[in-house]
Swiss-Prot record:
This is Ribosome-binding factor A. The keyword Cytoplasm applies. GO terms for cellular component: cytosol. GO terms for biological process: maturation of SSU-rRNA. It holds the Pfam family RBFA. HAMAP family: RbfA. SUPFAM superfamilies: Ribosome-binding factor A, RbfA. It is found in: Cytoplasm. NCBIfam families: rbfA. GO terms for molecular function: ribosomal small subunit binding. Monomer. Binds 30S ribosomal subunits, but not 50S ribosomal subunits or 70S ribosomes.
Length: 127
């Protein structure tokens, strides 16, 4: 059975796609060039949208990226209004999403434990 999404979830996904395209193609600020939008959460009244992003640089230069995004937020919101038809255009709030880095770190730790365990069992003559 297909997963059902609420209207606000569909709108949030459309906002994420449109913002990603706008940032990639229209925003000329080099500070925001290498980011990926990971999620958008919109309040039920559509007044606010939390826009989560990651950067190829990790947390390096995060302040500059946030400054660039905040400076572009008016332009992004205006252009978003031309592309997405909703009764209230949300105010954009940008947040760094560190979950990708945490997930990568967890994966590295698990891989290391598996390698250590394999090496221990290889050296153990009883196994």
């Amino acid at each position: 059975m297909p997963k059902e999404f609420s209207r606000s979830q569909r709108v949030a996904e459309q906002v994420r796609r449109e913002l990603a395209e706008l940032i990639r193609l229209e925003v000329k600020d080099p500070r925001v060039g290498f980011i990926t939008l990971t999620d958008v959460e919109i309040t039920p009244d559509y007044a606010h949208a939390k826009v989560f992003f990651t950067s190829m640089k990790g947390e390096e230069g995060l302040d500059e990226i946030l400054t660039g995004l905040h400076r572009a937020s008016g332009f992004l919101r205006r252009e978003l209004g031309k592309r997405v038809r909703i009764h209230t255009l949300p105010e954009l709030h940008f947040h760094y999403d560190s979950s990708v880095e945490r997930g990568s770190r967890m994966s590295q730790l698990i891989d290391q434990v598996v390698r250590d365990d394999d090496a221990r069992h290889k050296d153990d003559p009883e196994s």
